[in-house]
Swiss-Prot record:
HAMAP family found in the cross-reference section: ATP_synth_epsil_bac
Superkingdom of source: Bacteria
Keywords: ATP synthesis, Cell membrane, CF(1), Hydrogen ion transport, Ion transport, Membrane, Transport
One cellular component term from this protein's GO annotations in UniProt: plasma membrane
One function term, GO molecular function aspect: ATP binding
Main subcellular location of this protein, as a coarse class: membrane
Compartment list: Cell membrane
Transmembrane portions of the chain: none
Subunit structure of this chain's protein: F-type ATPases have 2 components, CF(1) - the catalytic core - and CF(0) - the membrane proton channel. CF(1) has five subunits: alpha(3), beta(3), gamma(1), delta(1), epsilon(1). CF(0) has three main subunits: a, b and c.
Annotated protein name in UniProt: ATP synthase epsilon chain
Function text: Produces ATP from ADP in the presence of a proton gradient across the membrane.
Native species: Alkalihalophilus pseudofirmus (strain ATCC BAA-2126 / JCM 17055 / OF4) (Bacillus pseudofirmus)
Matches recorded under Gene3D superfamilies: ATP synthase delta/epsilon subunit, C-terminal domain, F0F1 ATP synthase delta/epsilon subunit, N-terminal
């Protein structure tokens, strides 16, 4: 089976670069599975895990928004933030989740604060899910 090159890039630099059999990303329209020779496209990403499958193994990268650019031989993910599980501070992610939940439960907030807290909660849950903890 042929492979496809994957690059995950943030404003801080490259997070992942490698060849995989399949990439699964979460776009605003739903999950998208990408195999080698996929048609070209660009799609906006939501907060979620990028799954990188090679053989019987799977790696994940926690991504917080951005875009995916697909070409027949390469997938480039331009993310606002992205982390490999080994780079995630689980205690910090748990604390962020608790802060976001408490802000969501607060009665004194406007719509903007609510959306910020909701997004922070999604990011924290995604980071914890990717680490498996």
């Amino acid at each position: 089976m042929s492979t496809i090159r994957v690059n995950v890039v943030t404003p801080d630099g490259k997070v992942y670069d490698g060849d995989v059999d399949m990439v699964v990303v979460r776009t605003v329209e739903g999950e998208l599975g990408i195999l080698p020779k996929h048609i070209p496209l660009v799609a906006p990403l939501t907060v979620g895990a990028v799954r990188l499958k090679k053989g019987n193994s799977e790696e994940q990268v926690a991504v917080s928004g951005g875009f995916v650019e697909v070409r027949p031989d390469q997938v480039t993910i331009l993310a606002e933030a992205a982390e490999l599980p080994s780079a995630i501070d689980v205690d910090r992610a748990r604390a962020a989740k608790e802060r976001a939940e408490s802000r969501l439960n607060s009665t004194k907030q406007d719509a903007v604060d609510f959306k910020r807290a909701e997004l922070a909660l999604k990011r924290a849950i995604n980071r914890l899910d990717v680490t498996g903890k």
